[in-house]
Structure formats: structure tokens, C-alpha cells
Amino acid sequence: MGTTAQLVPTELLPEALAALAKQMEQDDLDPSLTQSIVKDLLTDPGKEGYKAAGPLKARAVQIRTESMAPPTATVVNGNVRTVIALVGTSGAGKTTAAAKLAAHFVAQDKRVALISTDTDRVGGLEQIRAYGSILNLSVDLAYTADEMREAMQNRRDADLIIVDTAGISPIDEVQKEILKELLREAAPNEIHLVLSAPTGLRQMRDAIQGFKDVGVDRLLFTRLDETNRYGAACSVAIESSISVSYLTNSRMVPGDIYATEPATLSKALFVRTLNGTAGS
């Protein structure tokens, strides 16, 4: 499905499809994606069966899901150490996401270690240490490449190491170089860009573009409980072709982290809630 489409006047659309297009627009889905989905539905061989809202939404979910990269949740098998890094802007929810991930794998009897590189945020160190205490995990601090190397060595027996990085601006090249240096020492298998779901489409796009050269290969959306508009998240997931790994609700640890199934985010757009659309 392309990201550009000629506008179809709403008044020319069947009633149910016009209502669906309006909902997608109100939910901040990129307008060109909305129009592309509308045109796909208009030309779909089964369009006569989509006159009711239910079947129409179901087909729209399917179309949008087919446009996204397959989801890729983290797999920890215990035979080879897995290292994941969470990157993103300040306030995206990286530390809480790191703790939720840690709790998720602790519950699977995995040996989990946390490493924090956040030296700047007020209360950041106390927050991750508090999460570590809740989960009975020690937290290593690594503010330099040498400290990261030492922390990785100290936690060499872990099944999973989660590196919670400091929030930085996607256009701050100096801070990005520092981040890259730390990541070179950590050598993560996965780099998740953490995006807060209430964030606007333009800001999400800027973050994805800005962190691209860091090696991001997954998107992790947080705070889905703080909005009922998931169009921006759906839009960037489609446009970027980057897999979505996890969705999170709330700041509760443990809990409220969902490994994305193929249609999770698409369904959430229409039902306006994450609950019931994915399994943790």
C-alpha cells in the first residue's frame, strides 16, 4: 500500500466507509494512509460485504496489518546471552519500559541484569534502582565506554541484559556520538526506539529519522493508556517498516507490557484501547 493517494471526497463514499475515514482522520492517522486504505476498500473484491461497520473495520485492520513489518518480540533462550538497548528522547518512558521488560523475563526464570547510562535526568537513577529493588535485581551504572565494558563483563552470566540509555534529542549529534560509543561496548542484539503513544506524528517521525543512524531495529510504544488516538503510532510503524516489539500501559511494574501480535496496533486504533488486543 502506498503512502500517497488521490483524495476521495467523503460525500462520495458509502456511509460506513465515510464514517471510518473520519475516525481514522480524528485518530491522527496520516491522511495519505487514510486515503490509501479508503481506496483499497473501495476496490476490494469483497467490498459488497463491508457495508456494515464491523466487517469494514475488520478488513481495514487486515489491510493496515499487511502494511506493517512483522512484530519481533525479544526471545531469550538461555543458551546465548541477549543484550537489548532502549533509546529515545527524554520522557519517552524508557526506564519504566526497561523495568517492565525485566519483570517480564524474570517471571520466565531468566537471569536478568539492568544497566543504566542516565546521568542527567533528575530522579532517573533513583527510579531504576527502585525498580531493581522491586525485582530483586542489581543495577549497574555505565556513564563511559570503560564503565560499560566493565558492566558487561560483570554481568556476563546473565541471560538478558537490558541497557536503559539516557534520553537525548534526536538532533543532538554530540549526544548521539556518546550514545553510539556506549552501544559499541554493549554490542546489543536489539535496539528498541521507545516512543510515547501520546506523542504527535511529526515528533515520532523526527525521532525515527534522528535515531536511525544509532541502529534502531525495533519500535516500542509506551503509555497507550494515556491516549485513545493511536493513528500516529500506526502511521510511523507503516512508514518506517521497522518492527514493533512491545506496547505498554501505565507505570506499573511488573505488568502491562504486551508482545505485539500482527494486528494488535491496528485493532487498538479502532477500539481505542489496548486492553484485550494482545497477550503479555
Predicted regions and their residues:
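NTP-binding/hydrolysis catalytic cores, primarily Walker-type P-loop NTPases
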Residues: 1, 235-280
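Primarily NTPase-proximal linker/entry elements flanking Walker-type ATP/GTP-binding cores
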Residues: 1-111, 115-120, 130-144
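Inter-motif core of Ras-like GTPase G domains
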Residues: 110-113, 153-162, 174-199
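Conserved ATPase-coupling elements of RecA-like P-loop NTPase cores
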Residues: 125-126, 170-176, 203-204, 230-232
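Conserved nucleotide-sensing/catalytic segment adjacent to the nucleotide-binding pocket
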Residues: 132-167
